[in-house]
Amino acid sequence: MASTVPSTMKAWQFSSAYPTIEANLKLNNNAPLPDGAKNLGPDQVLVKVIAAGLNPVDFKFAEIPWLGRFIVGSPSTPGMDFAGRVVATGPNTKSVAVEDLKPGQLVFGRLDSPCKFGTLAEYTIAPRKGCVAIPPGARVIETACVASVGLTAYQSIVYRLKDHAGKRVFLNGGSGGCGTFGIQIAKQMGCHVTTSCSTPNVDLCRSLGADTVIDYKKTDVIAELKKMQPFDLVVDNVGVPTDLYWAAPSFTNPGAPYVQVGALAVTPGFILGNFFKARWPGWLGGGKRPWEFMHIESNVQDYEQLGRWMQEGKLRAVVDEVFGMQDDGAVKAYQKLRTGRAKGKIIVKIDETWED
């Protein structure tokens, strides 16, 4: 491995997250390799990154006042999702059920959490449980954006309903990363899907399989939901309207889970509000529907299912735009992501010579 891995790499890095990470992102042409790159630990995979998919969590944790620097380290490279090629693997402890990954194999996946050595770099170290082979026929660049949102959508729907066929699911926010995958996954499971989006994205959501689309620019979302048959599951990808959860008893069946995926910002008020939703008794003013903030766990079998659906043409990544590594590509990519107006996913191509 020593002969194939350079001593330095190109990586986008930031040393301050104030006021935003993109305001401080710089391309370092001589960044150090991730710690342990030449001496991999158990169940680690060194990946040469071809493309990285962006997610709001990339900057939301880093930008938490005071704590962000300690969570991700400094200087830091953002990014959790990737598609790339295996360079080397560490000892396999069999702690997770994975196939043997071979050097040269094309893979996609995600890191466990935002960290100092993210995926907006030429090399990253992924856990084996978060790294699986790209199925034949899949577009490599598109798989770079699948892991986080695909897994979130899959686990928020498949894990939360015992019987899926005919169940009514409301996805709040259908045109972003989690929403576009969520619509397709819920339909694969046989659910009836209602979602919300703005006027320009109505046709997109319908094309992905949504049965009913609420245009929040033209009507009140909660008022429309109250007119419909009760739902069995709510997945909130955006966090607005802010009173959506508190109104849930008026448009959901008793016991229907409410899964919080997205939020405008991680603030003290947001954290306190979530405590009341999750822990405070309903008779004392707390939540009257089971509420949880979505936490995903990398699972090889789930990634492989997503890959099979993509291979079979049953699941597609909706890509808003692909940026390059050079010319402030990462800066522009995060600026667009932060607007909240992207249709689907935003990708940064790390290896600009790669063509699917």
Swiss-Prot record:
Q: What induces it?
A: Expression is significantly up-regulated at the end of late growth phase, in the presence of Butyrolactone I. Expression is positively regulated by the pgm cluster-specific transcription factor pgmR.
Per UniProt, NADP(+) binds at: 57-60, 175-178, 198-201, 216, 261-262, 342-343
Native source species: Aspergillus terreus (strain NIH 2624 / FGSC A1156)
Question: Its biological function?
Answer: FAD-linked oxidoreductase; part of the gene cluster that mediates the biosynthesis of pleosporalin A, ascomycone A, as well as a third cryptic naphthoquinone derived pigment, all responsible for the coloration of conidia. The pathway begins with the biosynthesis of the cyclized heptaketide 3-acetonyl-1,6,8-trihydroxy-2-naphthaldehyde by the NR-PKS pgmA.
Output a single Gene Ontology CC term carried by this record: mitochondrion
Q: What is this protein called?
A: Trans-enoyl reductase pgmF
This enzyme's EC code(s):
1.-.-.-
Q: What happens when the gene is disrupted?
A: Does not affect the production of the naphthoquinones derived pigments.
**PANTHER family assigned:** ALCOHOL DEHYDROGENASE RELATED, RETICULON-4-INTERACTING PROTEIN 1, MITOCHONDRIAL
Q: Which family does it belong to?
A: Belongs to the zinc-containing alcohol dehydrogenase family.
Q: Name one GO molecular function term.
A: oxidoreductase activity
- Keyword match Cytoplasm: no
Q: Which residues cross the membrane?
A: none
- Per the UniProt record, one Pfam family is ADH_N
Keywords assigned: NADP, Nucleotide-binding, Oxidoreductase
Would you say which domain of life the source belongs to?
Eukaryota
